[in-house]
UniProtKB/Swiss-Prot annotation:
Gene Ontology biological process terms from the UniProt entry: ribosomal small subunit biogenesis; rRNA processing
NCBIfam families given in the database record: 16S_RimM
GO CC field: cytoplasm; ribosome
Protein name, as recorded: Ribosome maturation factor RimM
Gene name tied to this protein: rimM
Subunit field text: Binds ribosomal protein uS19.
Length: 179
């Protein structure tokens, strides 16, 4: 598997107590994936970490083979990864919810006009913004290289993950024009 087959799910922080617990900073929307016996990868290594205990109330985690403070210090600042395949299995989505990794690189259209492709998703607190890299055709016409579309019904009509396409209302092109 290549690096693009994995997604960041958490960052490990400082040690907590003497038994090897470390602070877990969840980088995903799915805290349910952090449970006893769940396994995660460490970037640029083949090493996997297996959860021995997870305390959701204070976001601390104890990994097998890291059950003392000295050993646990080796984990500080590491990023945990999960395979996209396993994420799909363990993280259940509701209707009209999507994984970030499914939205990224989707082409964005307003009717038959290709506006660009999603290169990032920003959380604004109340909602999300799709960061769009403008189609070369619009850049040549002196429109901005990057613009943002709110992930709201007013702007996004339909997302087709199978075709990797997002269809927007007429207001999306207005955003591009006025960016």
């Amino acid at each position: 598997m290549s690096e693009k087959d994995f997604v960041q799910v958490a960052k490990l922080g400082k040690t907590v107590g003497l038994k090897g617990y470390v602070k877990l900073h969840n980088l995903s929307d799915f805290s349910s994936q952090f449970k006893k016996d769940a396994t995660f990868f460490i970037k640029n290594t083949k090493e996997m970490l297996k959860i021995k205990h997870y305390n959701a109330s204070n976001s601390t985690v104890l990994f097998e083979n890291y059950e003392d403070i000295e050993k646990a210090k080796e984990l500080i600042n590491l990023i945990l990864f999960q395979s996209i395949e396993k994420s799909r299995q363990t993280c259940k989505l509701k209707k009209d919810e999507f994984f970030y990794f499914d939205i990224l690189e989707c082409e964005v259209f307003e009717e038959d006009k290709r506006l660009g492709k999603v290169i990032d998703i920003l959380e604004t607190g109340a909602s999300y913004l799709f960061e769009i890299q403008s189609d070369e055709k619009w850049v040549e016409k002196k429109y901005p290289k990057i613009f943002f579309i709110p992930y709201l019904d007013k702007f996004v009509k339909n997302i087709d993950i199978e075709k990797r396409q997002i269809f927007c209302t007429q207001d999306a092109f207005l955003i591009l024009e006025n960016s």
